[in-house]
UniProtKB/Swiss-Prot annotation:
One of its GO terms (molecular function) is metal ion binding. The lineage of its organism: Bacteria, Pseudomonadati, Pseudomonadota, Gammaproteobacteria, Chromatiales. The reaction center is a membrane-bound complex that mediates the initial photochemical event in the electron transfer process of photosynthesis. It comes from Allochromatium vinosum (strain ATCC 17899 / DSM 180 / NBRC 103801 / NCIMB 10441 / D). A ubiquinone binds at residue 222. Keywords: Bacteriochlorophyll, Chlorophyll, Chromophore, Electron transport, Iron, Magnesium, Membrane, Metal-binding, Photosynthesis, Reaction center, Transmembrane, Transmembrane helix, Transport. This is Reaction center protein L chain. GO terms for cellular component: plasma membrane light-harvesting complex; plasma membrane-derived chromatophore membrane. InterPro entries: Photo_II_D1/D2_sf (IPR036854), Photo_RC_L (IPR005871), Photo_RC_L/M (IPR000484), Photo_RC_L/M_CS (IPR055265). It is found in: Cellular chromatophore membrane.
Amino acid sequence: MAMLSFERKYRVRGGTLIGGDLFDFWVGPFYVGFFGVAGFFFALLGVLLIVWGATIGPNAELQTYNIWQISIAPPDLSYGLGMAPMTEGGLWQIITICAIGAFVSWALREVEICRKLGIGFHIPFAFAFAIGAYLVLVVVRPILMGAWGHGFPYGILSHLDWVSNVGYQFLHFHYNPAHMLAITFFFTNCLALSMHGSLILSVTNPQKGEEVKTSEHENTFFRDIVGYSIGALAIHRLGLFLALSAVFWSAVCIVISGPFWTRGWPEWWNWWLELPLW
């Protein structure tokens, strides 16, 4: 892939966290770095272990290469927080380590790229929230509940079954107040950024013979429709806040389900019915 005209001046030494100049190079447009190598290693090992797990299966009947049916299940609850045999959940434990290694390596690679460019660490900071949500699901919550078996299985359909089953364990998971906040932030984020994206497209794609519109048109549109324009920079701050809030409350909603609340979530709202106001 050809290098863009402005890229060469940014391909400078330094900014690395580990390894010095050893891995300080690019492969095509991709910066490698120590964490690029580490991330590739963990990702490749994890994928190969999933393929191996699909090959051996927990039993002969469940050996499959159907991508929809492949499932690497966590250990049985009886193993607690100990290591399980490879075919009884140990594979899931090792793949989890690989996933964590790959995700963290990717984030640290982003840090190195930011250091090279002299820009802020907003991108790795945002990605860290996604990593944190994953850690809550496969590390924090299982530890709080006393068994790795409370983690979710690695499989397309099997992990959807896990989500459904956990929801039914708490009757109506949508009554979880943190889940409500997470969904609210998800939808609000979609609304805000879709409105922003459509506005930019509308002013930068004029009809034939017309000029490209300016930020004055953008601000005027939103002042006309909702009475306020947040501005070009602030809409991105708002989008980041909404996205990170959605991820944060998603992690909260699952980590409190089980370790801190064991009954159906509709019961949590009894305090509302017992208010003296009624």
